[in-house]
Amino acid sequence: MDILKKSLFIVLFLGLVSLSICEEEKRENEDEEEQEDDEQSEEKRGLWKSLLKNVGVAAGKAALNAVTDMVNQGEQ
């Protein structure tokens, strides 16, 4: 009976150790995925920022051209 108890204890202990290792690996994988998501979000923000900047520059140039045309028409 004593041998059976020791064997059962060893099996349970090894099961808990392997479960703990699996949980740790799972947490590491989740952390890596979260970091990848953060990097992708930063890339998207950078793309939106450059897109909005380019749109702003284009709108500014268009407005400047419109004002210049109005001034030129007023001089004629």
Swiss-Prot record:
Sites bearing Glutamine amide, chain numbering: 73
Domain of life from the UniProt record: Eukaryota
Family the entry assigns: Belongs to the frog skin active peptide (FSAP) family. Dermaseptin subfamily.
GO BP term, example: defense response
Principal cellular location given in the protein's record: secreted
Stretches with biased composition (Acidic residues): 30-41
UniProt note on tissues of expression: Expressed by the skin glands.
Cross-referenced Pfam families: DD_K, FSAP_sig_propep
Subcellular location field: Secreted
Prodomain positions: 23-45, 75-76
Annotated keywords: Amidation, Amphibian defense peptide, Antimicrobial, Cleavage on pair of basic residues, Secreted, Signal
The protein's name: Dermaseptin-H1
Lineage of producing organism: Eukaryota, Metazoa, Chordata, Craniata, Vertebrata
GO CC aspect terms: extracellular region
Segments for region (Disordered): 25-44
Protein role: Has antimicrobial activity.
Span of the signal peptide: 1-22
